[in-house]
Every structure is written in structure tokens, then in C-alpha cells.
């Protein structure tokens, strides 16, 4: 994509003068098939990036707000008095806040306008933390929707640690393609997927499409199907599902961009390519904003949990039979 602040130098005026002096000696019918439109169509297509050098204040502001908001909600979740008032799966909410805080910390490193002597390992680490935390948050929300209330009631002991390690491990593996594809170019930490890493571009796009697009669609489809059939309430719907609104466009646009790059979809006009580039930038900006929105969503979940009664869950079969026995003896 091109850069609006530093456009490509246009010396067409000089070339046009030389061209007119050169062609004045030739008859008008010397180039019978010459078409000016064909020459313009063959010119390179330059897009104006929205997240260019001037977007550095946006990255810094989002980072500061995200760190402050995430730190505040973490302090509230870890308070001893508050943990007894929270009927939700508190460990999952804490992990979501930690993921949001980690993303907020590395946002300035990913900024377009932050130039300097960035080392490659720091760039790799920033992308690992950013996408690893994003994938982990998505998986945690899906896990919380399916098992959160049950785990909060203490009916699945010993499962939290294994699920936590597994989810964050899977998130780290899913972020490896973008980590290997990132590099420092002219002092900027960017994702290039150059050389032998070109294949990783499609793997990364597939991972984003699966986690940010297919996962929420699967949750919605399962919830709708179980509602129609009158089955169990799982997955439980809460305000945390709003989180996917910030990353759903990112998964869609990366998938579309991969189809265009692989020639599965042919973009024949420059305005269409420019529109796709703009959508990619808008989706990236919206995804970055999630680190500010996530603490607000967590605060709303905590408010609802502390002002409502704990969810009623079916008792296990063994516990029900034991209660019946006690009732018969009485």
C-alpha cells in the first residue's frame, strides 16, 4: 500500500514535455493502436494507508487507555472481598483482563509511526503477545460460554488449570505464523511474509478466520439450534460476545485478502484494490480498540454478577439421589 504522507514523486510533467518534443517528428498514424487508457490501466495502483505515520497518537492513546482500564478491572477482580461476591468463573475473567493488558502494552511497538532501531526479536515478541492474547481471549470467551457457569459453581474440580494452559498454548501456536512473518523494515515493526514465509500468510489468515469468524458463528448457531429444540441453555449468552465484533472484520478481511493474493478472486480495478486496502486498515484499527472495550465488557459482567443471584444449574445424579435418601429418612 502507498503512503499518503509520502506520495510517490510524480514527474509526469517533465516526461510529458519530452514526449511531446519526441513525437512531433512522427506522423499521427505512426502508432495506430496506441491507446492512452491502456497505459493508465497498466500504471501501478497506490493506496493511501489509514494507519500510516500520522496514526502514532492513535496507537499511543489506545495503549494508555487499555493499560489503565485493564489494570483497574484486574484490581477489582483480585480484591478478596469482591471474589466472594462474584458468581461467574472469576479465573476466566481475570485471564481476559490479563490478555487485554498484554495487548495494550505492545500496541506502541506495532505502530506505523514509531520508527527507530527496533530489533527483530522485539518485533517477533510484540506480534506473539498481540495475536497470542487475542486468540486466547477468543478461546476463553468460547470456553466461558460453554462451561463458565458450571465451573463457577465448582462442579468440575481440577479442570481450570488444564484448560488455562491448553487455551494459552493453542493461542501461542496459532500466532506463530504471524510471528515468523514479521520483520523490521526501515526501523518499523511490520508483517511482511516475505521470501519463504509467504505460505504463512495464508495459514495466519485461516487461523484468524477460524477463531474470529467461525467460532462466534458456531456459538450463535448452536445457541439458536438448542433454543429451537428446547435443549439445555448452553452456550450461555452474555455481554462478552460483543468482543467478537472488534475482531470479526479482521478475520473476514484477512481471508478476503488471501483469496485476492492467491488469484482465487480477481480484482481488476484499482478502486477495488484501494477499497480492500482501506477495509484492512479499518479492521485492524477496530481490532486494536478491543483492548479498551474488553475491560468495559468485563466491568459490565461483574456488575451483573454481583447484582443477581447465582445461576441455577442441574444437580449431579449422585447428589440428587443422596438428597432423596436423606429426605426419605426424615
Swiss-Prot record:
Residues in the Extracellular compartment per record: 1-57, 111-123, 182-201, 260-281
Source superkingdom: Eukaryota
Cell compartment(s), UniProt: Early endosome; Recycling endosome; Membrane
A single GO molecular function term of this UniProt record: G protein-coupled receptor activity
Chain segments annotated as transmembrane: 58-78, 90-110, 124-147, 161-181, 202-222, 239-259, 282-302
Glycosylation sites: 12, 35, 52
GO CC field: early endosome; membrane; recycling endosome
Gene3D superfamilies, A to Z: Rhodopsin 7-helix transmembrane proteins
Membrane topology annotation: Multi-pass membrane protein
Residue ranges that the UniProt entry lists as topological domain Cytoplasmic: 79-89, 148-160, 223-238, 303-330
Keywords: Disulfide bond, Endosome, G-protein coupled receptor, Glycoprotein, Membrane, Receptor, Transducer, Transmembrane, Transmembrane helix
Disulfide bonds: 45-270, 123-189
Alphabetical list of InterPro entries matching this protein: Duffy_chemokine_rcpt (IPR005384)
GO biological process, one term: regulation of chemokine production
Function: Atypical chemokine receptor that controls chemokine levels and localization via high-affinity chemokine binding that is uncoupled from classic ligand-driven signal transduction cascades, resulting instead in chemokine sequestration, degradation, or transcytosis. Also known as interceptor (internalizing receptor) or chemokine-scavenging receptor or chemokine decoy receptor. Has a promiscuous chemokine-binding profile, interacting with inflammatory chemokines of both the CXC and the CC subfamilies but not with homeostatic chemokines.
UniProt record similarity statement: Belongs to the G-protein coupled receptor 1 family. Atypical chemokine receptor subfamily.
PANTHER family listed in its UniProt record: ATYPICAL CHEMOKINE RECEPTOR 1, DUFFY ANTIGEN/CHEMOKINE RECEPTOR
The protein's name: Atypical chemokine receptor 1
